[in-house]
């Protein structure tokens, strides 16, 4: 069973955000792909850190012509710290927008209202590989038992990363 507590990110409602994050096991913080990281998002992130809650940042409105996913991602890294690492990233294919799963290195695009597998654009390959390596390193940093054993980690990383990400976000009752 999953319960979702929706709290507005406006600074005026910080009390409601505090109550929601306190009651929840984890926090999903939304930032606009058009306007970036808001003060409310920063406050929510800081509170989730203070309360030792798992955090997920979603960059919305990436389908807007004026959105800049990577600008907002870099802003998030500067403000919230280097552990901000994307798992899903958008890409443009003509007038369509697709998404790349950094973990599985699989791209999807919506055609006629249905998501279908697509090829990762050549222009995105290096960036996706860099993000995959950063994601692996950040996930490995959460594992006190194995983080120093890089040989073990690289031999087991395909399954380990998925399992560790699930554990950190869903199973780790802090």
Model regions: which residues?
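Loop/turn-to-beta-strand initiation segments
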Residues: 1-3, 25-26, 54
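Switch II (G3) loop of P-loop NTPases
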Residues: 2-13
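Inter-motif core of Ras-like GTPase G domains
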Residues: 14-35, 46-47
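P-loop NTPase catalytic nucleotide-binding module
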Residues: 32-174
